[in-house]
Amino acid sequence: MSEIGVAVLGVGLMGADHVARIASRISGARVAVVNDQVTEKAERLAATITGCRAIADPLDAIADRDVDAVVLATPGPTHEKQLLACLEHRKPVLCEKPLTTDVETSLEVVRREAELGVRLIQVGFMRRFDDEYRALKALIDGGELGNPLVLHCVHRNPVVPGHFDSAMTVRDSLVHEVDVTRFLFDEEIVSIQIVKPTPNSLAREGLFDPQIAILRTASGRHVDVELFVTTGVAYEVRTELVAEKGSVIIGLDVGLVRKSAPGTWGGTITPSFKERFGQAYDTEIQRWVDAVRSGGTTGIYTDGPTAWDGYAATAVCEAGVQALQSGQPVAVSMVDRVSIPGA
């Protein structure tokens, strides 16, 4: 396949960014169709792109003959129906998180894809494509740091929308650290606890902020995550790995820094996720497009996190919301992957 036609469903902040990315920086793809629940927004955007059309119904957009692949940047509650439509039409899809909003529907999506015998769903956990996270993963896999022991994470936002509640801190923010943990350690998370320290007096009433998440992996590794979404400062995402033979920090806006390495650093903090992970998004979409284009030959239409990864993240976050409410550690409940051939 030479150039693929992509439908972008949902053209809010994330979707519009993907439209601009595909239209200007990604090779081998064009934006063929856009869709949004605000029809006028999609129509205005389509008018700025040669050969692009706005289609009001998302299922019609998926089925359209000019569409070879789909990017889902729609609200989470719509994902199940749209993902199943993509599977029905056998169209590769890159779905922004979450896969779906609950464990049962996420598992159903995993099963439906597995029944087809072809991998069509990729989930948009973009940190796996970030140069710093990839360098950290390579260090772990290379073994020079010895056995990884502990992961310390920081996830801060300057501000969040008015509808953002305490559970969304788990589902929308922590979900990235959940996937990072599984990506770096190649194992599942088996329990989660949410600790609520002294609250930020500047956060609106009813929003517990900050929160501290404590994760435990199947092999017993400890992961702690500071989640602080009303700092009023900037967008900050940092990760420190502590291993048997040293430690590594990423997210200092200067690239990977090893504790023993000489040098100094300084500069500004990235204002939002678009700047911090711009390279990761570009790499993610380009690799996905390349996989879709070669899928007819290879039989593989994805190059990144799978539907199973989306299901696992949903399962951990669902347990996390329970832990937020109870204040106690909660076991993560998942089916055994081997019980679903092809998952």
Swiss-Prot record:
It comes from Mycolicibacterium vanbaalenii (strain DSM 7251 / JCM 13017 / BCRC 16820 / KCTC 9966 / NRRL B-24157 / PYR-1). HAMAP family: IolG. Homotetramer. This is Inositol 2-dehydrogenase 1. It is an enzyme of class 1 (oxidoreductase). InterPro entries: Gfo-Idh-MocA_inositol_DH, Gfo/Idh/MocA-like_OxRdtase_C, Gfo/Idh/MocA-like_OxRdtase_N, MI/DCI_dehydrogenase, NAD(P)-bd_dom_sf. Belongs to the Gfo/Idh/MocA family. The lineage of its organism: Bacteria, Bacillati, Actinomycetota, Actinomycetes, Mycobacteriales. It comes from the Bacteria. It catalyses: myo-inositol + NAD(+) = scyllo-inosose + NADH + H(+). Keywords: NAD, Oxidoreductase. GO terms for molecular function: inositol 2-dehydrogenase (NAD+) activity; nucleotide binding. The gene is iolG1. Its EC number is 1.1.1.18. GO terms for biological process: inositol catabolic process.
